[in-house]
């Protein structure tokens, strides 16, 4: 219906997000020129996605739809490489096409593929180097490079962690050896962690706060 309305009024839907049942209308999406941004394997967690399947991304891609893998979760958003790999497991997608769903394809959806999404001369020098195949759960980030500058180096990070641990041990030892009683401490009050997701406003009202 959305695509019919768009065509009636002379515009095109660029991307359908959270389209967990997109496989049902993938041919129509291709005809319309719409792309898809979907979760990898979420299904049946609410009525609207009762018929979602983990083959969704692959089936849409097979119809020629440009597909990206997304997440609105703070934790899962850090592991989209592993989320993309699920389409290899479930749908038999090639590794190259799976990687595109979290690199080049999202850039295409945002119309930024002229400067990001792939390693090519003239594009932004934003690169992540892994210890293994980035689609493997064993892979660890070795380097993160933004605009050609190394912002994360795993070996240096280990050295920093060791230095911080030694400093922590030194401070604790000094505290234990001190004869001073010090002032009365303030009771520790744990602040709830704020966690935002796509349904936060609907669940928590206008404040947009959701605590766990």
Give, region by region, the residue ranges found by the protein language model.
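Catalytic beta/alpha-barrel core
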Residues: 12-21, 41-46
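His/Asp/Glu-enriched, well-ordered alpha-helical/loop segment
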Residues: 27-30, 34-130, 139
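Active-site environment of divalent metal-dependent phosphoester hydrolases
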Residues: 1, 19-26, 76-77
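C-terminal cap of metal-dependent C-N hydrolases
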Residues: 120-164
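C-terminal recognition in membrane/secretory proteostasis and scaffolding
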Residues: 134, 172-212
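Conserved, well-ordered alpha-helix/loop/beta-strand core segments that scaffold catalytic motifs
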Residues: 1, 5-9
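Short helix-capping segments at alpha-helix termini
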Residues: 9-10, 92
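Pro/Ala/Gly-rich low-complexity, hydrophilic intrinsically disordered segments
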Residues: 153-185
């Amino acid at each position: 219906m959305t695509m019919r309305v768009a065509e009636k009024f002379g515009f095109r839907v660029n991307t359908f997000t959270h389209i967990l049942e997109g496989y049902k209308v993938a041919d129509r999406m291709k005809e319309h020129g719409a792309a898809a941004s979907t979760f990898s394997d979420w299904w049946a967690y609410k009525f609207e996605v009762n018929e979602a399947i983990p083959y969704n991304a692959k089936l849409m891609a097979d119809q020629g739809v440009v597909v990206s893998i997304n997440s609105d979760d703070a934790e899962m958003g850090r592991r989209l490489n592993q989320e993309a790999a699920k389409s290899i497991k479930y749908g038999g997608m090639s590794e190259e096409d799976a990687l595109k769903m979290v690199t080049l394809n999202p850039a295409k959806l945002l119309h930024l593929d002229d400067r990001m999404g792939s390693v090519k001369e003239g594009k932004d020098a934003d690169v992540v180097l892994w210890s293994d195949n980035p689609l493997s759960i064993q892979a660890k980030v070795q380097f993160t490079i933004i605009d050609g500058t190394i912002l994360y180096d795993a070996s240096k990070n280990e050295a920093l962690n060791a230095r911080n641990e030694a400093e922590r041990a030194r401070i604790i030892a000094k505290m234990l050896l001190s004869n001073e009683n010090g002032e009365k401490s303030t009771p520790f009050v744990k602040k709830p962690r704020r966690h935002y997701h796509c349904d936060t406003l609907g669940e928590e009202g206008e404040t947009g706060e959701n605590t766990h």
